[in-house]
C-alpha cells in the first residue's frame, strides 16, 4: 500500500537540470529518462499497480541486481581513464618539460650546451655520447680523430727505440727493409740484454775491432809471442808471478769467441763481407761446444793450480797427457802426486802472454782456440780419478762433468 502512495509522489530529482539518474527510482516520473544509453519512458499508474498486485518480492528482486549496476555504470562525474602503457606517459611527460626548458633558457645557455656536446663527442667513445644530427661540425671532426688514432698503430711509431722484443703489426715490404737497415746502423742494443740472452753475442764494438785487423800484422805478432816461449822458464824462475800469463790469456779467449759469433752475424747482414770472414767460420763451429766451460772458467775457479794447464799450446805436453792417461789406473796414489808436480812444471813452460792491443783480436787466435778447448777433455781424466780420490779422502763429494775439472786438484794440489 505504501508503494502505491509513493508512486503517486513525483520524483524530486526530476526538477533538477540533470534529471533523475536512478534506474530503480520508485517515484513518479512524468518525463522520459536516458541513463547511460538506457531509455526509460515516463512511469504510468497501471504498471505500478500490476507490480504492487503481484507482491512485494518481485520489486525487491529487481532492485537487488540493479544496485551493483548503479555503482558501476552511473557516471555522476567525468570518467577517469587509466593508462597501462607507461612508455607513452614518459614521452608525454618529457615533451612538456622540453617545451618549458626551451622557453626558460636564453640563447647563450643553448649555445653553451651545444658547445659542451661537441666537446664530449670529440673526447672519444669513452663517454658513449652521440651528437644530434643538427651539428655538422662534429661530423667533420669525428673521421679526422679516428684517422689520427689509427696512424700510430699502422706506422709502429708508438714503439720505443731500442726495444727489440716488440714488433709492429702492420708493415709494407719497403718499410720492413728500411727498418732492418736502420736497426743495424744504430748503436747496439743494451749490453745487459745481450748478457741475458747468452753472453754478449751482439756486442758491436768487438765486431768492429775484429774486422779492422790485417792478416799479416796478426801473423807477425803471433810469431813474436811464440819466440818468447823459450824464455818463459827463466823468467818464471827469476820470480815472475805465475798469474800474469794466465790473466792475460783468459780475457782474449772470451773476446775471440764473441768476435767469431759477431762475424757470423755480420755475414748474414752483409753478404759482401763473406770473403774476409770465410776462413774464420770453420773453427768457430768447433769451439762452440766448449763455450760454456770457457765462460765459467774465470768466475768459478780463481785458483792458479790446474787452470794454467788449460792454455798450454805445446803439443809435446799433450802427448805426455795421453801417456799418463793410458797408465793411470795401473799406478798408485804416489804416482798421482808425481803427476801433479809434472803439471806444475808444464805450466811454467807456457809462454807469457800480455794482453794484446785492439788489433790483436785476429784470425790466428781464432784458429788456436779450438785446439785449446780440446785440452780440458784430455786433462780431465788425468786430473781426477774417482776411486783414487775416494780412497785418499773418504768425505769427498761427487761432482758433475763441469765441476770435475777443477775443485779437487785446487783443494789438494799443494803438499
UniProtKB/Swiss-Prot annotation:
Which is an annotated Pfam family here?
zf-CCCH_3
Q: Which GO terms describe its biological process?
A: poly(A)+ mRNA export from nucleus
Residue ranges for the region (Disordered) are 39-77, 220-247, 346-415
Sequence ranges of Basic and acidic residues compositional bias: 220-238, 365-380, 400-415
- Its domain of life reads Eukaryota
**PANTHER family found in the cross-reference section:** RIKEN CDNA 1700017N19 GENE, ZN-FINGER, C-X8-C-X5-C-X3-H TYPE-CONTAINING
Q: What is this protein called?
A: Uncharacterized protein C12orf50 homolog
